[in-house]
Amino acid sequence: MSFDTAKYPTLALVETPDELRLLPKESLPKLCDELRQYLLDSVSRSSGHFASGLGTVELTVALHYVYNTPFDHLVWDVGHQAYPHKILTGRRDRISTIRQKGGLHPFPWRDESEYDVLSVGHSSTSISAGLGMAVAAEREGKGRRTVCVIGDGAITAGMAFEAMNHAGDIKSDLLVVLNDNEMSISENVGALNNHLAQLLSGKLYASLREGGKKVLSGLPPIKELVKRTEEHLKGMVVPGTLFEELGFNYIGPVDGHDVQALSHTLKNMRSLKGPQLLHIMTKKGKGYAPAEQDPISWHAVPKFDPASGTLPKSKEGAQPTYSKIFGQWLQETAAKDSKLMAITPAMREGSGMLQFSRDYPQQYFDVAIAEQHAVTFAAGLAVGGYHPIVAIYSTFLQRAYDQVIHDVAIQSLPVLFAIDRGGIVGADGQTHQGAFDLSFLRCIPNMIIMTPSDENECRQMLHTGYHYQKGPTAVRYPRGNGTGTELTPLSELPIGKGVVRRQGKTVAILNFGTLLPEAQAVAEKLNATLVDMRFVKPLDEALLEELAQSHSTFVTLEENAVMGGAGSGVNEFLMAKRLAVSVLNIGLPDVFIPQGSQEEIRVDLGLDAAGIERRITQWME
C-alpha cells in the first residue's frame, strides 16, 4: 500500500520518533487522528491485530514524544497493541506486510528494530524484563529510563505481581503504564483525575512528599497520621492502594485518549525516582465504532471493508474448526455429566467455549491469564471428585509445565488437557507455534498423549481421555478446520492402539496427527504402508514389532519438533528391542518457526505431500 501524503499530512512528517519530537505539542491530536485512520486503512487491507492498537494511539504518541527512544527503553507487554509503535518507528510503509511471510513481525521483535528492546508475544513479561533493564540502566549510569506498558488483562498474571513486588523492594527507577480498557470514564471524572495526575506527578508534590518523609521519619505517630491522611485523600478519587502497598507511587486513572494531558503527565513522571505506576483508561477499538462495540470480535481480523463495518463470514460449506468441535463435545458431555468442569486461562473464544460458558456457567471457569493456577486448580477439582478439563493452547501450556508434573502427573490425577493450536499455527510466528508439546509431555510418567488425525478421532479421543481415571491425558489438535469426515457416536478407544490405514511394502509411514491426508497421498504413490498411530504415549509396541518384521524402513510423521517428539519415541523403542529398521523422522526442525500462512510454512518445511514424498525418496536413494 503506497503512502498517501495528502491524506496523512501530519503523519507524513513522522518517519521516526526523532521527527515526532520536532512537532509542536498542538499538532499531536491531529497526528493521532491520522495515525488511527492509517492503522484502519492498513489492517483492513492486510489482516492483523486491530482493536488493541486503535486503543493505544495516543499513549504511543505521548511515550515517543516524551521519552528519548530508543535510548530510553520502551517495553510492550504481549505486543498486540504495538502496531502504532511500529508505524512511528521507521516501519510505516511496511505495516501492510505484518504477520505475512517475509513481512513485519506480528509483535515487537528485537531483530527487526532497535526500538523493539524486547521480543514479546506471550503476556505479563514486560515488568520483569523492564525491571532488569532498569537495574542495568542504573549500573550504566547514563540516565536511561525504562517504561513498561501492560494491559489490565496481562497484569492479572502472577508473574506481573512478582515483578512489581520485587520492584517495590529494590526501588529502581521504573515506570509501569497500566493500559486499562475495561472501564469507561465520564467527562467529569476524567477531567478531575487528569488534573489530579498532573498535580501528583509534578516536581512540587514529589519534593514535598519526599521532604516530608525525611522530616517526619523520627516522629512515628505523626508520620503514620500523615500517611493515612494522604491515603484517604487519594482514595477518594484513585483506586491505587494495591500498587502503593507494593511500593509503587500510583498516579491515575487518567484519560488515555487525551494526548496532550498524557504527554504532560508523562513528562512530569520521567524525572521521578523509584517505581511509578500510571493508570490510564482507554477504549479498545477507539475511533472505529464496530470495534468499540465488539472489541473481542475485532481483536484480530482478516481483511475487511471498513465502510461495511462487518467482518467477512466463513466460507459456505467450510468444515468446523477443531476448536468448535471441542466446544460441541463439551456441550454434549456436560449435558450428561454435571461433574464436568471446564477451565480456560482467558481463551474462551479461541478455544471454542463461548456457548458452553453461557449454557453451563456453573461448570465453566475462566481463571484469567494464569496458566499455572489453571492446572493446579484442575488438580484440586480432581481431588474433590470432579472431572476437570483444561482447555489451553499448546504454546501457553509451556507456562504451566511444573504444575503438570508436580500437581497432576505425580499424583496420577485424572485431568484432561485439551491442547489447541498444536503444530504450525501460522501468522503469529515464533512465540505461538505449537512445536514442543509432544516433546515436553512425552517424558512425563503417567501421561497418556493422543494425536487425532481428523475431527471424528478428536471427539473420540476427548471422550476416551475424559473417561480415563488412572492419570492425566492429553488430546492435541491443530488450528484450522476439520476434513469433513463423518462424526460417529462417542466410544472409548483402546489405549495405546494404532490403526493400519493402508497395507503396502518395504516402507511404513507412521503418522501422528492431522498430516494424515498428506501421508495418504504419499503412501499411494510409494506403495507404502500407512499407519494412524493415534497414541504418542503409550506407543502401539505390538504393532511396531509386527511392522518391523515386514518393513525395512519406518518414516515417522508429526507436526512437532523432531527432537524428543513422537518419532523419537519410535526410535527409542526400536533400539531397546534391537529391531533392525532404518528410520526417517519427519517433523519440525530445530529452529523457531517464523510467521506465514500454515500452508506456506508447511511447504517451506517439506510437510506438504510433495515435500514428504521428496524427503522420503531422497533419503532412500
Swiss-Prot record:
Gene3D superfamilies the record matches: 3.40.50.920, 3.40.50.970
Cofactors required: Mg(2+); thiamine diphosphate
GO CC aspect terms: cytosol
GO biological process: 1-deoxy-D-xylulose 5-phosphate biosynthetic process; isopentenyl diphosphate biosynthetic process, methylerythritol 4-phosphate pathway; terpenoid biosynthetic process; thiamine biosynthetic process
Sorted UniProt keywords: Isoprene biosynthesis, Magnesium, Metal-binding, Thiamine biosynthesis, Thiamine pyrophosphate, Transferase
Function per UniProt: Catalyzes the acyloin condensation reaction between C atoms 2 and 3 of pyruvate and glyceraldehyde 3-phosphate to yield 1-deoxy-D-xylulose-5-phosphate (DXP).
NCBIfam families hit by this protein: dxs (TIGR00204), PRK05444.2-2 (NF003933)
Quaternary structure annotation from Swiss-Prot or TrEMBL: Homodimer.
UniProt name for this protein: 1-deoxy-D-xylulose-5-phosphate synthase
Organism: Pectobacterium atrosepticum (strain SCRI 1043 / ATCC BAA-672) (Erwinia carotovora subsp. atroseptica)
Gene this protein is translated from: dxs
